[in-house]
Structure formats: structure tokens, C-alpha cells
């Protein structure tokens, strides 16, 4: 006759709220702490990226744009829907034109005639705006481009003449898609190209084509 042994489990049953719930709680707490630390690290890192470098103030920009000129005329234009549409047509589909107002500074000769115009623009680079000036000859072509204020630790090479000179002589009807890139400054290059193209398009529509 086979003998069957029945073993009785004498260990007490685990009570709810034992070890595993506590471990799970600590895991969740550690995960949340890690997320918060990462968030604050990213926030601090973003703040540290803001490095403002001023190369030209407004007065210096005007002197550079119009050397020797004794009188500068400021002209502010509120754009009509027709003007904005004409500017948008020049810019094409890749640039969305959102401006409602444009301010130009005109250097005047002794006879009171404009020898050129300057516009100050702002375009977002990687995270912060690049403030720049564009000098435009009476024929609507670019004479000079200068970075006035740069606010990021990378991409500042766009302020060099070796890059900026690519814009010289270009007008509203000229291509801007063949501007050479700078390694490590792609976003800044795009922003400057966009800003200069907008400047010549505005000048063409307002003062050359005289669209109302």
C-alpha cells in the first residue's frame, strides 16, 4: 500500500502592504526624482546657452551704413494687404511673411536725395533672435549686411564678411538658395538668408514697384 504524505504549509501568509508594495513605491519615487532632475538640468542648460554679444548699436549701425552723411530720415510704413501679398509672392512658399510694419532709415546727400536705405531685422537662429542690419542701394540690391547682436554660443561665424559678402549685389529677383552653408551654423545661415531676402523684397515692393 502506497503511503501518501500531506505536508502542511505552516508559513504565515504574506500580509498586504508588505515588502513589494514598498519597493514599488521607492521605484516610482526614484523615477519621478530622475525626471525632475532631468527637467531642471535641461532648463538650466537652456539658460546657459544665452550669450548676448553686441557688435553694433543703432547709432553705430547708421554710421556704418551711411558714412559721412549728416542727415538720416526714418520712415515707418504700415503694410497693406496688397503690399504683403506682393512681398509674399517674391519670397515664395518657403518663407511665411508675417510682418505688418517696416521701418527704413534713409541716408540723405546734401541735395536731400536718398543714397541708400538701411533696415534692422530680427530672425530666430537656433533658440534666440539674431539682430542684424541690411543696407540697400537705391537700385534695390544689397550693399552690406552686418550682425548687430548675436545671442547664442554657436553659429556666430555668420557675422564674418566671408559669409555676408555672398548677399552683396543681390536683389529681389535674384536667387538666395545658393548661399553657402557654414558647418555648425546651419540654422543661423538659414535665418540670415531669410532676413536678407525679406529686406530686399520689402524694399522692392514699397519703394521700387511702389505697390500701395
Place the predicted regions along the sequence by residue.
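Positively charged N-terminal leader segments that act as targeting/secretion signals
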Residues: 11-23
Amino acid at each position: 500500500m502506497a503511503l501518501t504524505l500531506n505536508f502542511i504549509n505552516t508559513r504565515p501568509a504574506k500580509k498586504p502592504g508588505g515588502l513589494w508594495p514598498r519597493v514599488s513605491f521607492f521605484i516610482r519615487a526614484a523615477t519621478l526624482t530622475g525626471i525632475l532632475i532631468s527637467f531642471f538640468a535641461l532648463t538650466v542648460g537652456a539658460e546657459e546657452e544665452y550669450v548676448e554679444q553686441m557688435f553694433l548699436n543703432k547709432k553705430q549701425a547708421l554710421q556704418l551704413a551711411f558714412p559721412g552723411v549728416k542727415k538720416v530720415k526714418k520712415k515707418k510704413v504700415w503694410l497693406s494687404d496688397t503690399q504683403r501679398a506682393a512681398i509674399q509672392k517674391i519670397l515664395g512658399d518657403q518663407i511665411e511673411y508675417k510682418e505688418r510694419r517696416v521701418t527704413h532709415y534713409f541716408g540723405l546727400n546734401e541735395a536731400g536725395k536718398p543714397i541708400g536705405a538701411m533696415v534692422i531685422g530680427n530672425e530666430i537662429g537656433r533658440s534666440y533672435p539674431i539682430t542684424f542690419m541690411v543696407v540697400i542701394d537705391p537700385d534695390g540690391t544689397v550693399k552690406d549686411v552686418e550682425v548687430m547682436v548675436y545671442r547664442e554660443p554657436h553659429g556666430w561665424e555668420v557675422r564674418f564678411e566671408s559669409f555676408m559678402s555672398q548677399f552683396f549685389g543681390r536683389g529681389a529677383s535674384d536667387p538666395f538658395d545658393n548661399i553657402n552653408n557654414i558647418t555648425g551654423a546651419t540654422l543661423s545661415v538659414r535665418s540670415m538668408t531669410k532676413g536678407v531676402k525679406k529686406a530686399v523684397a520689402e524694399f522692392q515692393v514699397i519703394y521700387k514697384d511702389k505697390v500701395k
